[in-house]
């Protein structure tokens, strides 16, 4: 990339701002393949940061610099590139469009104050993008729509515009119309043509008059409806021509309020529309001063008064992304909400995920409060870091080698520690069991997983104590693929995916007696232990009870604990299909001992054998874990989801309306039927549904399903 960075925009000349009023933080969102990363290339060229654009297919773009992104030719992580236009610093936040990487999208939304919804002219709007628009509406985030890929063979601007308006509402109106190698401004009624990176202005052709007038009328009415001047509509309807400057002023206010959403067509390959888009971003989108800060608390959880987005206010910043680079080490991407960050200063680092979310992520992100020294500050241009003397309120920067700060942590003045309420991260719901291909790589695997979990809050690492498996909880197959790819290429660990074992359990269906006999007397010191036990089932959750009813010293007192130890060891191994036995009472009734050959080990073996014989004398049932799930699904897919849940042995508990044509389905489903549900639900509802899950209880597995498990264990 270095050969494409203009000399005047090189490492020593990163765009800077004197205060939050000179910053715009813009996140690009939309479907995968919509052209977000390529659009950023075109904007960087338009702002003369780059001399020419890079290519996704060639792996040369600014924002897709990760090895996995280059190989897969799609974004998998958040990236930031900044430019200066008309005296304003614009931080462009690129996010992945694929649903598996929604954690990166969430971080991008947190870092930004406004959003560009990027829609390809040959594709339209998908369901997750519609849901995201509703989410942004609920928090009042200012938005604009960019229709890209105007030069695609199947491009249809009119259809894409209609799809955006159908999905996002009637306040989505174009400011420009595409025309040949340029755009027609609907307010200025001028044609802007692009050639050799330059924009020229001329009068549109007469053949465009009708469509200009139609679109211009709708635009003007839309702007006037959002005007704070209530007399403007009356004057307009009375035939008065409203001055263009008045319309522009009202337009900019409505965009900043998040009540009007301009549409800008852009052809990234030719640069058409890039300057118009930058004008909307710098003049219409609000500065960080106009965007409310996240909720602020003390480390003890006490609400704190809202801080001003001001350079001189107390420091309040947040780590929105953490990466590990093999050459420069750990890099933290930080959004400054108030105050100023300077190099060689000490800040307080607070992480309080579990305080806010009940421990949901505390296994990989434990609560912590500690001081840390700031080293080198820089402004990111994708992977390239450009030195920063200071970072003002509202800006985004990169900080190298923060050893204690993790994604989601708050940085504040050590004299007045504060905590920002973390943004809500989606729970990873796809379990993938893995093992190091070579046993010698197990330590490297542990290190690599620890570092990846610190970087990615949507990745959860589980060391399952019952199944003895390492389980990655991921957002989907693509997310899991990137994790495995990174382990192999960054940490040099070859990993095998193995069959996931659901932690089933076994219990006795009825009372049974067992005789355990472990006798070996072939000369020398032998082994001698005999015991008789009775096994009784207990209610769910009762655990294990051991009773001693031996009379007459048939089993010497010192060996009775060994019988229990042997029973417990066999319970851990299972007596039916290799799963732990739970909820039983074992009563030691009788036994025999030898004055010389009896030993601790002999009675342990006798206890284990007695339990196995008791199991053979009665019915042993498998218990399976049941989860309660809550599925949020568009109404159009409710029938399909209900049918699918039924096929998974699910019991529907009820449904309720969630608004925005969505329904919540609550059901209980066996865990064994949910191992791929994150993938299947996405396919079933075209990516528009989501679900949560929580453990409910264990209950007997149906005999047909249990028989398949037993056959597999055999």
Curated annotation (Swiss-Prot):
Region G4, annotated ranges: 148-151
Keywords for the protein's UniProt record, in alphabetical order: GTP-binding, Nucleotide-binding
Region (G5): 267-269
Location of the tr-type G domain: 21-289
Region of interest (G2), residue spans: 73-77
Positions contributing to GTP binding: 30-37, 94-98, 148-151
GO biological process terms held by the UniProt record: ribosome disassembly
InterPro entries, per the entry: EFG_II, EFG_III, EFG_III/V, EFG_IV, EFG_V, EFG_V-like, EFTu-like_2, P-loop_NTPase
GO molecular function, one term: GTPase activity
A Gene Ontology cellular-component term: plasma membrane
Superkingdom per UniProt: Bacteria
Region annotation G3: where it falls in the sequence: 94-97
Disulfide bridge positions per record: none
Region (G1): 30-37
Record's miscellaneous remark: Was identified as a high-confidence drug target.
PANTHER family found in the cross-reference section: ELONGATION FACTOR G-LIKE PROTEIN, TRANSLATION ELONGATION FACTOR G-RELATED
Homology family: Belongs to the TRAFAC class translation factor GTPase superfamily. Classic translation factor GTPase family. EF-G/EF-2 subfamily.
Database matches in NCBIfam families: PRK12740.1-1, PRK12740.1-5, small_GTP
Protein name: Elongation factor G-like protein
Naturally occurring in which organism (per UniProt): Mycobacterium tuberculosis (strain ATCC 25618 / H37Rv)
């Amino acid at each position: 990339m270095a050969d494409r960075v203009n000399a005047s925009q090189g490492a020593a000349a990163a765009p800077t701002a004197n205060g939050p009023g000179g910053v715009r933080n813009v996140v690009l969102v939309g479907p995968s393949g919509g052209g977000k990363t390529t659009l950023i290339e075109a904007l960087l060229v338009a702002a003369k940061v780059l001399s020419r654009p890079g290519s996704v297919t060639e792996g040369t773009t600014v924002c897709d610099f990760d090895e996995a992104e280059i190989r897969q030719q799609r974004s998998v992580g958040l990236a930031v590139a900044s430019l200066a236009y008309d005296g304003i610093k614009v931080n462009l936040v690129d996010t992945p469009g694929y649903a598996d990487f929604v954690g990166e999208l969430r971080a991008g939304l947190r870092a930004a104050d406004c959003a560009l919804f990027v829609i390809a002219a040959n594709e339209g709007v998908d369901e997750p993008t519609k849901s995201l628009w509703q989410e942004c509406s609920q928090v009042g985030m200012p938005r604009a729509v960019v229709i890209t890929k105007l030069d695609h063979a199947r491009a249809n601007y009119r259809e894409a515009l209609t799809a955006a308006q159908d999905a996002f509402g009637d306040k989505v109106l174009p400011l420009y119309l595409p025309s040949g190698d340029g755009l027609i401004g609907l307010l200025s009624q001028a044609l802007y043509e692009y050639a050799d990176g330059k924009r020229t202005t001329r009068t549109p052709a007469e053949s465009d008059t009708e469509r200009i007038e139609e679109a211009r009328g709708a635009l003007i009415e839309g702007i006037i409806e959002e005007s704070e001047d209530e007399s403007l509509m009356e004057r307009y309807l009375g035939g008065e021509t409203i001055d263009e400057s008045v319309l522009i002023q009202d337009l900019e206010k409505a965009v900043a309020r998040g009540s009007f959403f301009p549409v800008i067509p852009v052809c990234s390959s030719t640069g058409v529309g890039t300057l118009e888009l930058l004008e909307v971003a710098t003049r219409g989108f609000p500065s960080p001063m106009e965007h409310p800060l996240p909720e602020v608390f003390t480390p003890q959880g006490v609400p704190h008064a809202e801080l001003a987005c001001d350079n001189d206010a107390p420091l309040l910043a947040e780590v929105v992304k953490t990466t590990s680079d093999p050459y420069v080490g750990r890099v933290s991407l930080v959004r400054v909400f108030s105050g100023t960050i300077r190099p060689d200063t000490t800040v307080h680092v607070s992480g309080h995920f579990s305080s806010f979310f009940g421990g949901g992520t505390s296994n990989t992100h434990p609560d912590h409060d500690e001081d840390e020294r700031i080293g080198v500050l820089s402004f990111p241009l994708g992977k390239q870091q450009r030195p920063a003397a200071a970072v003002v309120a509202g800006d985004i920067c990169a900080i190298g080698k923060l050893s204690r700060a993790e994604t989601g942590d708050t940085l504040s003045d050590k004299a007045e520690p504060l905590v920002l309420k973390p943004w809500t991260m989606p729970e990873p719901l796809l379990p993938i069991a893995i093992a190091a291909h070579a046993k010698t790589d197990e330590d490297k695997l542990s290190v690599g997983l620890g570092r990846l979990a610190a970087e990615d809050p949507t990745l959860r690492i589980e060391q399952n104590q019952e199944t003895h498996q390492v389980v990655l909880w991921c957002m989907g197959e693509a997310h899991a693929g990137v994790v495995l790819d990174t382990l192999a290429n960054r940490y040099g660990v070859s990993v095998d995916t193995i069959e996931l074992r659901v932690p089933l359990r076994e219990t006795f269906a009825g009372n049974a007696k067992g005789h355990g006999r472990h006798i070996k007397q072939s000369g020398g010191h032998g082994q001698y232990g005999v015991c008789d036990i009775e096994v009784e089932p207990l209610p769910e959750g009762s655990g294990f009870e051991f009773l001693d009813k031996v009379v007459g010293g048939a089993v010497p007192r010192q060996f009775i604990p060994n019988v229990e130890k042997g029973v417990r060891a066999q319970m851990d191994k299972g007596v039916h299909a290799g799963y732990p036995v739970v909820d039983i009472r074992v009563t030691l009734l009788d036994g025999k001992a030898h004055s010389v050959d009896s030993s601790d080990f002999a009675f342990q073996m006798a206890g284990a054998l007695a339990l196995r014989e008791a199991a053979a004398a009665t019915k042993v049932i498998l218990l399976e874990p049941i989860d309660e799930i809550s599925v949020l699904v568009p109404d159009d897919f409710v029938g399909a989801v209900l049918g699918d849940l039924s096929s998974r042995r699910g019991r529907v508990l009820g449904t309720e309306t969630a608004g925005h044509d969505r329904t919540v389905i609550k059901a209980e489903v066996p865990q064994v039927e949910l191992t791929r549900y994150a993938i299947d639900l996405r396919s079933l509802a075209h990516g528009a549904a989501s679900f949560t899950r929580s453990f409910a209880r264990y209950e007997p597995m149906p005999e047909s399903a249990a028989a398949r498990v037993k056959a597999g264990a055999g």
